[in-house]
Curated annotation (Swiss-Prot):
Name used for this protein in its record: Cellulose synthase catalytic subunit [UDP-forming]
Organism listed in the record: Salmonella typhimurium (strain LT2 / SGSC1412 / ATCC 700720)
Pathway annotation: Glycan metabolism; bacterial cellulose biosynthesis
Enzyme Commission numbers on file: 2.4.1.12
Stretches assigned to the PilZ domain: 694-790
EC class: transferase
Cofactor(s) required, per the database record: Mg(2+)
The reaction(s) this protein catalyses: [(1->4)-beta-D-glucosyl](n) + UDP-alpha-D-glucose = [(1->4)-beta-D-glucosyl](n+1) + UDP + H(+)
Amino acid sequence: MSALSRWLLIPPVSARLSERYQGYRRHGASPFSAALGCLWTILAWIVFPLEHPRWQRIRDGHKALYPHINAARPRPLDPARYLIQTLWLVMISSTKERHEPRWRSFARLKDVRGRYHQWMDTLPERVRQKTTHLEKEKELGHLSNGARRFILGVIVTFSLILALICITQPFNPLSQFIFLLLLWGVALLVRRMPGRFSALMLIVLSLTVSCRYIWWRYTSTLNWDDPVSLVCGLILLFAETYAWIVLVLGYFQVVWPLNRQPVPLPKEMSQWPTVDIFVPTYNEDLNVVKNTIYASLGIDWPKDKLNIWILDDGGRESFRHFARHVGVHYIARTTHEHAKAGNINNALKHAKGEFVAIFDCDHVPTRSFLQMTMGWFLKEKQLAMMQTPHHFFSPDPFERNLGRFRKTPNEGTLFYGLVQDGNDMWDATFFCGSCAVIRRKPLDEIGGIAVETVTEDAHTSLRLHRRGYTSAYMRIPQAAGLATESLSAHIGQRIRWARGMVQIFRLDNPLFGKGLKLAQRLCYLNAMFHFLSGIPRLIFLTAPLAFLLLHAYIIYAPALMIALFVIPHMVHASLTNSKIQGKYRHSFWSEIYETVLAWYIAPPTLVALINPHKGKFNVTAKGGLVEEKYVDWVISRPYIFLVLLNLLGVAAGVWRYYYGPENETLTVIVSLVWVFYNLVILGGAVAVSVESKQVRRAHRVEIAMPGAIAREDGHLFSCTVHDFSDGGLGIKINGQAQVLEGQKVNLLLKRGQQEYVFPTQVVRVTGNEVGLQLMPLTTKQHIDFVQCTFARADTWALWQDSFPEDKPLESLLDILKLGFRGYRHLAEFAPPSVKVIFRSLTALIAWIVSFIPRRPERQAAIQPSDRVMAQAQQ
């Protein structure tokens, strides 16, 4: 390069060009790219007057106007990138100038939109105020009960007839489109309206569209002339029918959540009943169990009416010694049949309380647990069971591996936040094995905890309901525990739940037998159907491959009609679920959860349907560590297989697009879009299988709690506790931190009007942020510390309202990012031979993306970018 430039150019220009070449090389450009960059520079100086002030201003704004082009490290096709970006800048600049006045009119539309939203937000309250006088009046009050029931029956009958006509009426494409526009317009009108009316209206609209879709699928979309297409189409129709049934049952289940509130206890404590607290354990570490016992000892309940029992199925001497030391009862079985259910039933022979509260050994109850739950038992004598949420202060594998802890609702939030509350409306609340209180008399009547299935909790509540007893659910978290530490343990737990619910379906089917109301039967049925999602989910993940690989028409209809039926069905269901479930499950996350579990719950549920007695009980491990970040290749193997299968479908789809019949082009495009969506979801499943490092034995809990620290010299400083664990705390001193690392200080915390002192040592000081490690505590101090932290009545209730509002489009974008993240992890942890393929694909995608124009960075707005571009056009 140097010799050639000296031969062709005068010395000053040659030296300048050589200096530029060396600069390119220092910034990482290859010799070819550096030489080509110099050549493009020469041509640019020849063609354009780059020394002119106008061009100098453009060059000064290079980073803002051309953010994706590195001028210090040229690439061979940079001129093409400059050309595309310049045309883009000219286009958006002229568009902005042309449409600037119109935005003022759009501001008026925005103002009208804001007023409409305000009007809709206040509509329910205005209607309530206008109709208050009607609450005491009954339009049909002069009629007998029989006449009123007859009129209601006539109304329901005519409504069903109209609904049937609406669902089954065939439309041509234009009529179907207009019908959908009307429904969509109504949905957009009511979706922002607060209160339950809007949710009910959205459910009606969603059911209308979905029922029309399923009717159309059964009557118009099966190819009876092609056996392969017929078989594949029936398989997909089976999965869609399952999804439709779950959708309908789900709407019924949560249509009117009860939101039960506590009932005050009698002021006279002598009327309070006796309670036994059971803490069953098998192979958990003693440190996991201690906090639960310490919290139980501090529950606000008369000590002579409270007995705490450690039910140790491991028969460990350390647990016996601990129980004796803290003053609680200890029971160890000589035989271990029926696992946890047998352990509890054995303890029932020894305990004599009127009620029994059950906590898993890692679930730490709050001090208010019994005061919040027991009032309902005294009010309703037929109430047999009160369930509270299972709240977790540690992230589950989805939250930890994806970095979403306390950013999006976790997998269980929907069940404990909405579904159980909806069940409560229909008197169908399930016993969940922990964080619950059961009345002894009904429990003894059914022979104790059910032992016939591995989900003894749900089966027990089913038996109680069959006996005519009621159940209740209170959505306020009154205990918190440890989530599963690894994805494999999480999947193992879900396998047990799935198999157990299917066992109940086979052995004690809620649809049959006496004692249950129709609503209870439907709620139990939906719970069992939920765990049968494995096979339908796998069908959805592979369905488009039937056409791409086998040329089978799984939906035998024109692409236009498919779009007019499928898209509204999905959009209305998503919109309705976002309205109903938004606080508890963000849009599209169910796809990730079900995909991760599908492969693993499909075989055991299928086996349980055939042979419900096959299989064994497994205990979910808690409190483990993940020493290093790694991909669980065993768990992720099915996802990778499905990814490869879908990539094969992409290749087949590309071939069909270019070489297949022209009349199938739209069908190929629709199938490829479906495949790409499946690949995104599978990428998310792969991302979950990358186990993040977890080296803390004691999980930190975020909180905002006032406190104080006292130095040994007597100086006192107020502070705010922002996190705590079983071994230490993080605090923020209100003012300048006047403590040193290694210094011993006392931490002062309040519970009610009582103040407690805990010895600590400073282990970290960063500004006014201080890390404290607890010094060895006495048993009394440890109990007090748990009472001031884990067992505070308000610790967990504040977490429920901390999640952001669900926005379906933003949630979809999160899922897309998550899918790409999964493939990036595959490239990161793959064997060297596979890494080459991933790196090549990544490089190819990055090269293609580098040509896409970008919006100018914000710095360009500081300079008059429109004027600069106008100068470039001159």
